[in-house]
Amino acid sequence: MGRTRKGRAISGWLVVDKPAGMTSTAVVNKVRWALGAQKAGHAGTLDPDATGVLAVALGEATKTVPYITDALKCYRFMVRLGVGTRTDDASGEVIATSEARPEDPEIEAALAAFRGEIMQVPPQFSAVKVEGERAYDLAREGERLDLAARPLWVESLELISRPDADHVELEMVCGKGGYVRSIARDLGQALGCHGHVEWLRRTWSGPFEAEDGISVATIDELAKSEELLAHVMPLACGLADLPELPATAEGAARLKCGNPGMVIASDVEFGEEAWASFQGQPVAVGIYKAGELHPTRVFNL
């Protein structure tokens, strides 16, 4: 007999405005505890010192996490010029310095090389796995790692402000797997002056925005209350980038059993990914083919 999962069967999204000094996993654990939820997970790690959007999926919404991790994300960050660190952020040991300070036109010109499809080497202190071990664990032991470059789509990278000669504030919109610390490091190298991230904030991730996020302090204050539950957004928010197809009653019943089900299509093309709903509730995600949705993920709501 299977073990009964403890907690409430809550499905949806809680958008947290993560504070600095807290890991993404710690935020997820706090949300799970505060809501008494059976299951929770996040849609994209933020470094402990970073702030901003951490979208926490609850229950059946965890099945939609890939659609948020694959979505575009926006980061606002400050690069400290003239100083390189082991971690490529302000927490690390200083390993290089330079007196050179580029002018704004030089920075603007250098940013062009970081837009579009780029190849990016992750920071030494990152969660990338090297022969089964996390890079940050090996780096802490003093190993110098030769990490492979990875592709990254950068939709935009803009200079926002220049508070002084030592600092430049940037905003980047990018796809899955981007390391802002690598951008700061590589930009500093391109400018011949070194650089690291001084602070970082994720302002939006897919459909979720920081201004809609709840603070950890508020989560603590409202823990175990129905008022906190009112902050949970519908599961369907995680499917914002996919077309919705209303299912027929019979189609919904078949989809819930994992079988192809009839849906009412509009302008969805054959072979396109979509999600089916019935009476306002998500039923399944799948591939549309000739009047039916062939499910790949079924929601038990």
From Swiss-Prot:
Q: Which reaction does it catalyse?
A: uridine(55) in tRNA = pseudouridine(55) in tRNA
What Gene Ontology molecular-function terms does this entry list? RNA binding; tRNA pseudouridine(55) synthase activity
Family matches, as InterPro entries: PsdUridine_synth_cat_dom_sf, PsdUridine_synth_N, tRNA_psdUridine_synth_TruB, TruB_C
**Gene3D superfamilies named in the record:** Pseudouridine synthase
Q: Name one Pfam family in it.
A: TruB_C_2
Family to which this protein belongs: Belongs to the pseudouridine synthase TruB family. Type 1 subfamily.
Describe its function. Answer: Responsible for synthesis of pseudouridine from uracil-55 in the psi GC loop of transfer RNAs.
Can you name this protein?
A: tRNA pseudouridine synthase B
- Species in which this protein is naturally found: Cereibacter sphaeroides (strain ATCC 17025 / ATH 2.4.3)
